[in-house]
């Protein structure tokens, strides 16, 4: 803020209020300084998991266009097909393994569950209701995308995992895959 009378700054437009306290700023600076260390740990853990899982016939991994730009935040496993992925996810759930996302059935991140979009349900009128819809969203089909996302299971990687935790996760994933 400017001056000594906090709250007297002008607000040129709605939505811009960048004030933070010195404490928040100090915490933010400290966290930002740790980002390179976190990325390094995440990448190492991701590579370790890939090495531990790569021998299994069910798993394949995405080829990244810029591996140097990968933060190592997620490990994406591709299974042979949607049905195999569903069975694999069921086994993970039965084992109580958390921390993964199966986007194919996710309520927020994939079109299969986007009834509010496909049926254009909103609180107010949409421009396409006035101007016309460029396509019929109710019958929208994305078979290539569904085939890819149906095979994908993603795991969030935590930089705080110990070597034992990484091995335990890999063993649990292999156990679930071997039950298929």
Residue ranges and their predicted role:
Residues 15, 72-74, 94-96, 152-154:
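Extracellular structured ligand-interaction cores
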Residues 3-6, 48-52, 89-152:
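Conserved PLP cofactor-binding pocket of PLP-dependent enzymes
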Residues 76-80:
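Short hydrophobic/aromatic beta-strand micro-patches
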Residues 154-164:
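Proline-centric
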Residues 86-95, 169-173:
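Short amphipathic alpha-helices in soluble, non-transmembrane regions
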Residues 29, 163-170, 174:
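Short, amphipathic alpha-helical "lid/cap" segments that border enzyme active or binding sites
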Residues 1-74:
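Active-site region of PLP-dependent enzymes
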């Amino acid at each position: 803020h400017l001056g000594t009378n906090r709250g007297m700054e002008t607000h040129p437009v709605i939505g811009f209020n960048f004030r933070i306290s010195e404490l928040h700023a100090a915490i933010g600076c400290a966290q930002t300084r740790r980002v390179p260390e976190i990325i390094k740990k995440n990448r190492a853990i991701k590579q370790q998991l890939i090495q531990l899982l790569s021998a299994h016939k069910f798993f394949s991994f995405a080829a990244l266009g810029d591996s140097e730009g990968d933060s190592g935040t997620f490990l994406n496993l591709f299974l042979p097909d949607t049905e195999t992925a569903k069975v694999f996810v069921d086994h993970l759930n039965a084992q109580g393994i958390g921390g993964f996302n199966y986007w194919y059935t996710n309520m927020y991140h994939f079109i299969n569950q986007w009834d509010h979009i496909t049926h254009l349900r909103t609180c107010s009128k949409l421009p396409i209701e006035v101007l016309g819809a460029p396509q019929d969203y109710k019958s929208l089909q994305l078979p290539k995308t569904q085939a890819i996302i149906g095979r994908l299971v993603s795991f969030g990687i935590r930089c705080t995992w110990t070597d034992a935790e990484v091995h335990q996760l890999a063993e649990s994933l292999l156990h679930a895959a071997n039950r298929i």
